[in-house]
Amino acid sequence: MGCGNSTATSAAAGRGPTGAVKDTTEDSITEDDKRRNYGGVYVGLPSEAVNMASSQTKTVQKN
């Protein structure tokens, strides 16, 4: 089927354990994944916007 496995049984046997491992790793999102570029569309906040937001929250605090 084009995925490198010659028989359907070996492909089905390989999907069980790897699928379970894949699900657990998708839950942990790294900083790199947050800033990933999908087909020319930027996903995530640029560092300038993050710095702006953090500096604004600091000035809002009153004693």
Curated annotation (Swiss-Prot):
The family database entries (Pfam families) matched by this protein are listed as: OCC1
For bias kind Polar residues, which ranges apply? 1-10
Which ranges of the sequence are coiled-coil?
Answer: none
Cited InterPro entries: OCC1 (IPR029133)
State the residue spans of region: Disordered. Answer: 1-39
- Say which family it is in: Belongs to the OCC1 family.
Specify the protein name.
Overexpressed in colon carcinoma 1 protein homolog
**Which source organism?**
Mus musculus
**From which lineage does this chain's organism come?**
Eukaryota, Metazoa, Chordata, Craniata, Vertebrata
